């Protein structure tokens, strides 16, 4: 599972703590601090397809520390600082936080720079996965950052043999 060491602790400890504090969704499990099957399915669906409305709600609640329906630079930095430490531990060069924030502003185009409302996040749902992954899922963030842009462009061209 994503919480275990053999998966490289894909999710950040801060995100896992918020999930087990039952912030994004109350557990149906009758055992304290344990997910039951239904809880796990909700989590996995939210983790694997971050473009669905329910998934966006789930991850938005994880990141929105003060529950005001706006993700602020402070909240993003709170989660990203753990990612930076994890990247450095793996000898990856982390992106500076200000650069990451700039990229997220370009992605979402919020009405107030650096402040991302739920509706603004939902409006870019086709590409919102990277917004959440850079803050909570190290493996998916690294995969995104190390993707081959030339190969992607080649795959997207109508006539790849002539590009």
Predicted segments, located by residue:
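Alpha-helical interaction elements in eukaryotic regulators
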Residues: 12-16, 36, 52-59, 72-76, ...
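Eukaryotic intrinsically disordered and solvent-exposed regulatory patches
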Residues: 21, 45-47, 58, 102-103, ...
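Intrinsically disordered, low-complexity regulatory segments of kinases
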Residues: 2-8, 14-17, 22, 26, ...
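Acidic carboxylate motifs that coordinate Ca2+ or other divalent cations, activating on Asp/Glu
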Residues: 66-68
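C-terminal interaction modules of eukaryotic adaptor/scaffold proteins
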Residues: 95-163
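Amphipathic regulatory helices of Ca2+-sensor modules
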Residues: 1-11, 19-22, 34-48, 71-92, ...
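Hydrophobic alpha-helical bundle architecture
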Residues: 61-63
């Amino acid at each position: 599972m994503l919480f275990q060491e053999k998966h490289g602790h894909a999710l950040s400890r801060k995100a896992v703590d918020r999930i087990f504090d039952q912030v994004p969704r109350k557990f149906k499990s009758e055992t304290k601090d344990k997910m039951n099957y239904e809880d796990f399915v909700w989590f996995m669906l939210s983790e694997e397809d971050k473009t669905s409305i329910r998934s966006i709600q789930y991850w938005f609640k994880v990141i929105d520390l003060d529950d005001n329906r706006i993700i602020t630079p402070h909240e993003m930095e709170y989660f990203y600082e753990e990612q930076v430490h994890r990247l450095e531990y793996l000898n990856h060069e982390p992106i500076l936080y200000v650069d990451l924030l700039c990229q997220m502003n370009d992605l979402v185009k919020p009405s107030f720079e650096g402040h991302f409302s739920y509706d603004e996040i939902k409006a870019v749902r086709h590409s919102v996965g990277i917004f959440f992954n850079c803050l909570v899922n190290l493996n998916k963030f690294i995969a995104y950052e190390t993707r081959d842009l030339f190969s992607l462009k080649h795959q997207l061209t109508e006539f790849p043999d002539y590009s």
